A protein has these predicted regions:
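Alpha/beta-hydrolase fold nucleophile elbow
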Residues: 53-67
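Short alpha-helix in the alpha/beta-hydrolase fold that links the catalytic acid
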Residues: 121-132
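Acidic catalytic loop of the alpha/beta-hydrolase fold
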Residues: 116-120, 149
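Gly/Ala-rich beta-loop-alpha elbow adjacent to hydrolase catalytic centers
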Residues: 66-70, 74
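A conserved short beta-strand
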Residues: 83-93
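C-terminal catalytic histidine-bearing segment of alpha/beta-hydrolase fold enzymes
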Residues: 133-188
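Short beta-strand/loop motif that positions the catalytic acidic residue
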Residues: 105, 111-113, 117, 144
């Protein structure tokens, strides 16, 4: 099993409600990648300290999963050189203003996307691939044909932007769990 912590990237000053994430909350974080990266790294350290204080989990076996904006954040966590075994991004934004430096990425990186996701078009997937190559990272990008954004959310039903996909959801999670098992066992 896993010990799971959730991160609030918005803070106490306000947060979105409902399924839509207003740009008034998301926009400033997207425009300030240094701030976003600092927050996600601070969250990792706070979670690690909390787990140690409570005596739960194994701090040497850390990974990060993220969905949509969270998927972007876990990619930035990897780009920053954070000491995590793996990061898994589900339908996250792949672009960054702070690409990984050569040799910086320690985590095994998995980005799972719909090939028809307007938030992560092919050009962005190609750019992430090139960035990971230059960084010398261990990476996998999986794009499901005919699949849109939010494919892991059974309530998503707004094609052509977002729509649930049972097969992409199932296969993506299977690959993510296999990556975690291998990363924690030192097989990759």
């Amino acid at each position: 099993g896993y010990v799971v912590f959730l991160v609030d990237m918005y803070g106490v000053t306000g947060r979105p409600t409902g399924q839509e994430v207003p740009m008034e909350f998301l926009g400033p974080l997207i425009k300030q990648p240094q701030e976003t990266r600092a927050r996600i790294n601070a969250a990792l350290e706070a979670m690690t300290s909390a787990a140690k204080a409570r005596g739960v989990g194994d701090a040497s076996r850390r990974a990060a999963f993220g969905y949509c904006f969270g998927g972007s954040n876990v990619l930035d966590l990897a780009r920053s050189g954070a000491d995590v075994a793996a990061v898994v991004s589900f339908h996250g934004n792949l672009r960054t203003g702070l690409p990984a430096e050569p040799g910086a990425v320690k985590a095994k990186v998995l980005a799972v996307h719909g090939a028809d996701d307007p938030i992560a078009p092919k050009g962005d997937r190609d750019a992430l691939e090139e960035e990971m190559r230059k960084a010398g990272a261990h990476w996998t990008i999986l794009a499901f044909g005919g699949v849109f954004h939010s494919f892991t959310d059974p309530s998503a039903n707004r094609p052509p932007s977002s729509q649930y996909s049972a097969h992409a959801d199932r296969y993506g999670y299977a690959l993510a769990h296999a990556l975690l098992a291998d990363a924690f066992a030192g097989k990759v």
